[in-house]
Each structure stands twice: as C-alpha cells, then as structure tokens.
Design a protein with these regions (language model features):
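Short Lys/Arg-rich cationic patches that frequently serve as NLS/NoLS or arginine-rich RNA/DNA-binding motifs
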Residues: 1-9
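A structural signal for multi-pass alpha-helical bundles of membrane permease subunits
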Residues: 8-318
Length: 318
C-alpha cells in the first residue's frame, strides 16, 4: 500500500523535477546576488560597519542621482508611449497586408498575392534590421550623423546657400555643432531607442494579432461594422494580454539605452542624457559599492511596484 502511494506521489509531481534546474539557476544568478546587494546597502564599504539607512539617505540627497533619476523617468515616459503606439500601428498595417495576401490567394490572384507578400517581407526586413545591428555600429552611425563634422552639419551647410529655409539655417547654425552636447541630445536618444526596439515590439504585437480569430472580423463585417469599430471593439480588447507583456519588456529595454550613450559620450555626457546607469558606472569606478547597492535596491523596488500596480490594474479591468 505504501509503495502504491509513493508511486502516485511521483506521478503527481513530475513538474518539480523540471522546475528544479530553472529554480537553481534563478537562485544562483538572481536571488542570491540580489540578497547580497540588499545586505551591502546597509553596510559601509570601507570598514564593513553597519550604517542602517545612511546609504539610502546619501543616495537620495545626491545631486547626480537626482538628475539621473529625473532624466531616466523623463526618458521612459517619453519613449514608451511613442514606441507602443508606433509599433502597434505598424503591426496592424503588416497584419492587414498579410490578410490581403491570403484573400488574393483564395481568389487565385497570384500577381497581387506575391505583391502583398513581398511588401510584408520588405516591412519585416526594415523593422528587424535595427535589432541585428551591434551597439558599436550604432555608435559609429551616431558619430557619422551628429558629430561636429558629421553628416547633419554638412547637410545644413549645404542647404545654407539656398533661399528660404537655407538662410534661416545659416543664421541659426553659424558654426559646427556637436549635437550630442546640446539639448537636442535627448531627442536623439529617444529616436535611437524607438528605432532600435521598434521591431522587437512589432513582433510581440504580431503574435497577439495572429491569435485573434479571423471569424470574428468576418462576423463583424457582415453586421456592418467598419474598420474603426472592429479596431476599437475587437482588436484592442483582444490585445490586452499581449499589451501587458509589451509594456513591461519595453520599460526593461529602455534601461539598455545606456550602452550607446556611454560609448559616444563617456561617463559624463550632456546633462539631459545623464541616466541612472551613468551614476552606477561612476560609483562603481570609485568603489562606492554601498551607494550603488542602495540605489540598486531603490530602483528594483520602484520597478517592482510599477509592475505590481500595472498587473493589478490589468486584472481589475479584465
């Protein structure tokens, strides 16, 4: 009897054996290091003495951290809505092109089917290309475009000899401008991030769009629903589960913009693009591990609260 119960337990819990390696990996490379970071945030780096919340107070009062936190928040608030809206529009456009290709296939219109499929393939190549470009290549592109002797300045000087807008540009730009050291640097950073991760979000939106049954659209079309009504009452409500994932991943990806900025402008870039990662990098170089640990815990707490609130609001509306 005991042998039978033992066999039943083994059959009931086979999933734990598959989850164990994953749990060990997350613990070794995630949970345990984070617990050590939390511990270090309450101790001084030099002598290892316990200082309580002193490190947190120093971080909050630090001017560099305050500037970086404001810039990072501004960057996320600006980038995420632009990225989500633009990627959703392009994903819906691409989905419509694929639907038209399927309709032409049913009507045996080979020429138009090939045209639509070719257009879809061209769109996919355009939005997936930035994902394949290494960060070092993006940095080279930035320097070619926005350096004081780069393409943008050359183009403006070429236009300065023309009438109208050329004269205006010649008045505004009397010398070569290093665009990454001006207020325009923030806009360049936003554009670069959206350009880099646009394809990533389009792929996620496409996964959600392809999961919506086409029969719903056909039934709505038979009932006289137009494109706008099907978009607002069918497409967007069915994309809610995917939207949660897209928002979270987009926010996490926004912290990866530091690589390009650091490689272009170094540890102390123009103040509008001085991000939290710059603070962490500078503190790491000066071995201020206690401050860096406290700031990391604070950032992790803010992100966790944001994710929980977002998840709660999603569940409440569903």
């Amino acid at each position: 009897m005991r042998m039978k119960r033992h066999k039943i337990r083994k059959k009931r819990n086979p999933g734990w054996y598959f989850l164990l390696p994953e749990f060990l990996g997350v613990s070794v490379f995630g949970l345990i290091p984070f617990a050590d970071v939390v511990r270090r945030s309450f101790f001084q780096t030099v002598d290892g003495s316990f200082v309580g919340i002193s490190n947190y107070v120093q971080v909050i009062k630090n001017d560099a951290f305050d500037l970086a936190a404001k810039n990072t928040l501004r960057f996320v608030v600006t980038c995420i809505p632009c990225l989500l809206l633009l990627s959703l529009i392009l994903a819906m456009l691409l989905q419509q092109v694929l639907i038209l290709a399927e309709k032409k296939k049913k009507h045996r219109d080979v020429t138009m089917e090939q045209f639509y499929r070719g257009s879809a393939a061209a769109l996919k190549s355009m939005y997936l290309l930035p994902m394949a470009i290494p960060a070092a290549s993006v940095v080279v592109l930035w320097k070619i475009l926005f350096d004081s002797h780069g393409f943008v300045n050359s183009a403006i000087h070429a236009l300065s000899g023309m009438n109208g807008i050329g004269k205006i540009l010649s008045v505004l730009l009397v010398r070569e401008v290093d665009w990454m050291n001006t207020d325009a640097a923030f806009g360049i950073l936003v554009f670069s991030y959206v350009w880099k991760y646009l394809g990533y979000d389009i792929v996620l939106w496409m996964a959600g769009l392809s999961a919506i049954p086409q029969g719903i659209y056909e039934a709505a079309e038979m009932d006289g629903a137009g494109k706008w009504k099907t978009c607002f009452y069918i497409t967007l409500p069915n994309l809610r589960p995917v939207a949660f994932t897209v928002v979270i991943l987009s926010v996490l990806n926004s912290f990866k913009a530091f690589r390009e900025v650091y490689m272009v402008a170094g540890s102390y870039p123009q103040e509008n693009i001085y991000l939290l990662q710059h603070v962490f990098s500078n503190w790491f170089q000066t071995l201020s591990v206690d401050k860096m640990a406290a700031a990391s815990v604070m950032l992790a707490f803010v992100i966790a609260v944001f994710v929980l609130l977002l998840e709660r609001s999603w569940e409440r509306e569903e």
